[in-house]
C-alpha cells in the first residue's frame, strides 16, 4: 500500500475540480487532484451533442487560458464554433490542462474519512492519500433523478436516465419514448433521429418549451462579483432568491435552443405535452405498450428518462462509505456551506451542484467554476503565508 501526503486533495477532475487545481497551482499550494479528467462529459454525454453555454464560460480563474484564447491559438473565433460542440469543448479542456500543467491521478476514491485532524482518502487500489484539506467536486452523476412514482410504473430494464443512455449505435429502426420536455429531452430526440430511430415520442407534464435562444448574459457579472462578496446570495430575502432562481429556471427550462428545431422537424417525432405515463407493460415480443394520460397508446422499444438531477450528498459513495457524512450539516440534502464552500467539517469543501442552495442556481452550471475555485483557495491562503496573494 502506498501512502501520499498533501495539503489539498481535490476529488473530481471535471470542470470544478480542474478550476480549483488551476487556482491552487497559481497560488503555490501543494495539491493532488484525482479522477479521470472530464469522465462524466466523455462517458455520460452523447457524441454529437452541443452545449448551451457560450465561449465565455471558461475554466481559468486568472482569465488567461480561456476558450477564446484556445480558439485564437487555432485561428478561430467564437463565431466559428458556436453552438459549442462537446468535441470542441473537450479539446479546449485538454488544452487548458496542458497550459496549466494539471495532471490528475486517474484513480477512484472509494471512501473518505477524518482521522486526527486530517483526512484519509482510500483508493479502490488500496492506496491512501492523507490530506489537510479536501475539496469534493462531485459533478452530476450520482444525483441523476428518477421519480419513485414514475419508476414504479416501468418494467425493470426498460428504461435508462439520459446520462446512462448515450451510445446510440443500436438506435436504428427502434422506437423511443423520452419522458421529459426540457433541453436534454429534445436534444436526445434529435440525436436518436439522426442515429436512425424509427420513431421518437416526447411526453412531458408541462407545455412544450419554446425554441428560443437562452439569455445568460446577466449571470456572469453576478457570479464573478461573488468573489468579492461571497455571501450576497444568502443575504437575499426568500422572495429575491426565488426570483433569481425562477429567472435562471425560465431561461434554462422554458426555452430550448433554436438549433434543435430543424433537426426535429420530422414525421418520426411526436410530442405529447401535458401528459404522463399511466401504465407501461412489456408484451410477449418485448415491446413496451405505454398508455398516456391523454388516452394515447404507443408502442416503443426503449424509454429514456430526461428527468434531471436532484442533490442528496448521502448518495455520494465516498461519503456514505466513510465516517464524515454524519458530521456534515445538511438541509434538504444539500451541505451547509460557509462563504468559502467549507462544510461544518473543518477543512472539507464541497462545490459544484451541491453548492446551489447556499450560493444560488448558478452553481449547477460551469460559469461558476472560476468563482468557487477562487473562494476555496482564498480560504486556504488565509491560513498560509506562502501563497502568491498573501
Where do the PLM segments sit?
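Flavin (primarily FAD) cofactor-binding/catalytic cores of flavoenzymes
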Residues: 1-38, 81-195, 199-390
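Flavin (FAD/FMN) cofactor-binding and adjacent substrate-gating region
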Residues: 42-75, 217-237
Amino acid at each position: 500500500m502506498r501512502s501520499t501526503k498533501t495539503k489539498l486533495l481535490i476529488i473530481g477532475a471535471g470542470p470544478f475540480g480542474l478550476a480549483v487545481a488551476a487556482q491552487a497551482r497559481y497560488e503555490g499550494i501543494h495539491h493532488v487532484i484525482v479522477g479521470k479528467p472530464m469522465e462524466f462529459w466523455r462517458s455520460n454525454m452523447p457524441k454529437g451533442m452541443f452545449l448551451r453555454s457560450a465561449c465565455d464560460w471558461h475554466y481559468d480563474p486568472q482569465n488567461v487560458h480561456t476558450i477564446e484564447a484556445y480558439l485564437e491559438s487555432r485561428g478561430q473565433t467564437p463565431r466559428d464554433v458556436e453552438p459549442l460542440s462537446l468535441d470542441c469543448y473537450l479539446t479546449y479542456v485538454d488544452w487548458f490542462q496542458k497550459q496549466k500543467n494539471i495532471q490528475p491521478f486517474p484513480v477512484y476514491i472509494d471512501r473518505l474519512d477524518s482521522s486526527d485532524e486530517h483526512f484519509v482518502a482510500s483508493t479502490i487500489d488500496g492506496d491512501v492519500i492523507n490530506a489537510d484539506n479536501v475539496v469534493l467536486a462531485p459533478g452530476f452523476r450520482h444525483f441523476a433523478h428518477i421519480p419513485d412514482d414514475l419508476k414504479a410504473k416501468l418494467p425493470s430494464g426498460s428504461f435508462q436516465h439520459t446520462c446512462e443512455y448515450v451510445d446510440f449505435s443500436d438506435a436504428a429502426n427502434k422506437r423511443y419514448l423520452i419522458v421529459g420536455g426540457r433541453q436534454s429531452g429534445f436534444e436526445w430526440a434529435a440525436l436518436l433521429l439522426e442515429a436512425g430511430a424509427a420513431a421518437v415520442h416526447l411526453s412531458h407534464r408541462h407545455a412544450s418549451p419554446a425554441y428560443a435562444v437562452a439569455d445568460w448574459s446577466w449571470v456572469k457579472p453576478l457570479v464573478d462579483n461573488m468573489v468579492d462578496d461571497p455571501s450576497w446570495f444568502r443575504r437575499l430575502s426568500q422572495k429575491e432568491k426565488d426570483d433569481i432562481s425562477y429567472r435562471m429556471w425560465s431561461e434554462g427550462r422554458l426555452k430550448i435552443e433554436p438549433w434543435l428545431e430543424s433537426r426535429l422537424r420530422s414525421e418520426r417525432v411526436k410530442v405529447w405535452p401535458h401528459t404522463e405515463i399511466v401504465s407501461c407493460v412489456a408484451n410477449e415480443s418485448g415491446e413496451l405498450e405505454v398508455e398516456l394520460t391523454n388516452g394515447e397508446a404507443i408502442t416503443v422499444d426503449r424509454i429514456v428518462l430526461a428527468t434531471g438531477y436532484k442533490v442528496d450528498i448521502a448518495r455520494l459513495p465516498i461519503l456514505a462509505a466513510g465516517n464524515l457524512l454524519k458530521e456534515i450539516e445538511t438541509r434538504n440534502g444539500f451541505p451547509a456551506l460557509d462563504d468559502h464552500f467549507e462544510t461544518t467539517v473543518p477543512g472539507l469543501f464541497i462545490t459544484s451542484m451541491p453548492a446551489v442552495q447556499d450560493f444560488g442556481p448558478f452553481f449547477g452550471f460551469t460559469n461558476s467554476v472560476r468563482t468557487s475555485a477562487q473562494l476555496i483557495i482564498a480560504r486556504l491562503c488565509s491560513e498560509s503565508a506562502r501563497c502568491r496573494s498573501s
